[in-house]
Amino acid sequence: MAVTTRTVSEICAAAKRAAWELAAAPTEVKDAALEATARLLGERSAEILEANAADLADERAAGLTSALRDRLTLSEARIDAMAEGVRTVAALEDPIGEELERKALASGLGLRKVRVPLGVVAVVYEARPNVTIDCAALTIKSGNAIVLRGSSYAERSNGALAAIVREALAEAGLPEDAALLVAGGGRAELAELATQEGTVDLLIPRGGEGLKKSLQDVATVPVIYAAAGNCHVYVHADADLEMARRIAYNAKVQRPGVCNAAETLLVHSDVASEFLPGALADLHSAGVELVGDERARELAGAVEVGVATAEDWGTEYLDLKMVVGVVGSLEEAVDHVNSHGTSHSEAIVTSSEAAADRFTTGVDAAVVYTNASTRFTDGFEFGMGAEIGNSTQKLHARGPIGLRELTTYKYVVRGDGQVRE
């Protein structure tokens, strides 16, 4: 089984031993493990769905919002998508061993800088079982072992998926302990995982501000926060308004419970009276609850728009709710995004290259779009096959965390007897 009775410390130590072996594995062996994972996902789909149904029926899931239940829910289509994502990762170029630099030193030594795995990557995530497979695929391909700590809501689903990964590793001749799942979803296990210096090389928590804050005070291992996404769509004065309506609708409605969904719509005052009635009617018809500033409410037409509070502008709803504001200039839009955003994904709709350039250089975010939905911030969409999360930090990775973001480098030096004088 993927879930063991070992302590967190024992799990991380076992993963470290597995990581040493996996780091030296040839590309074809790692790819064989991934192909086996994809195949087993199809063969075991009934078992996976049974485990997922039990999670959804559990009383612990009864109070989940519709968005969180959507995150927790698996289907044949989502399992097929997971398998396809694994195959895509298998087909990607292996980053391990890539030569980043080569030079001859004055001492006569030959120096090479080569890409190597991080070692053990621990991932903490909430109610999205597909993360189990996405993360495992990326870590296997990049030569890392993984320790997974999922939500208690998805305990059965995660267990079924992690067991498949372990079986696939063994089938390929790799150590099963390269993929381990920590049982229990309590704070004690989380705090212990965050303090495994010497065995955990990187911790990636995927979740909201509550998870981030719970780790900031205790973590002693390196952490990359795949944190909240309070994303904005800004409609500039010269925007194609039909395009802007499609983008705003897609960014909010297509899948509201994910971190790259838009939470705020900003509109330039020059086009607000023309744009807002239709755009807000679109959103309202999709069940989006709308709140806004005074100007947006005045221009909403027949659509009911509530009063936005100060907290609304900084909230990641992860649901069918959106805050709407009218701004007087591009500079005001940039200032608003930088003041209230989470450095995740931001979008401008404009026909002006100058406006696009000002927005993309002025906004402090991992991903900035011109004339496109924020929903594209995703490892699969970016050609990475999958992602472990989206980093809103600037060190060690920013944006989707794919294969190369799960590596570091070492210097390999070759001599013929040199000693330093």
Regions of interest found by a model, annotated:
Residues 25-32, 96, 172-179, 255-261, ...:
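Flexible, glycine/charged-enriched surface loops at secondary-structure junctions
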Residues 1-110:
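N-terminal Rossmann-like NAD(P)+-binding subdomain of aldehyde/semialdehyde dehydrogenases
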Residues 2, 6, 126-128, 134-145, ...:
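ALDH superfamily catalytic-core signature
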Residues 188-192, 211, 329-332, 355:
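Short acidic active-site motifs
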Residues 118, 309-421:
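Conserved C-terminal structural/oligomerization subdomain of aldehyde/semialdehyde dehydrogenase
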Residues 102-103, 111-117, 139-140, 171-175, ...:
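Solvent-exposed alpha-helices and their adjacent loops that cap or buttress functional pockets
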Residues 91, 95-167, 172, 200, ...:
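Conserved small-residue-rich beta-alpha loop and adjacent elements
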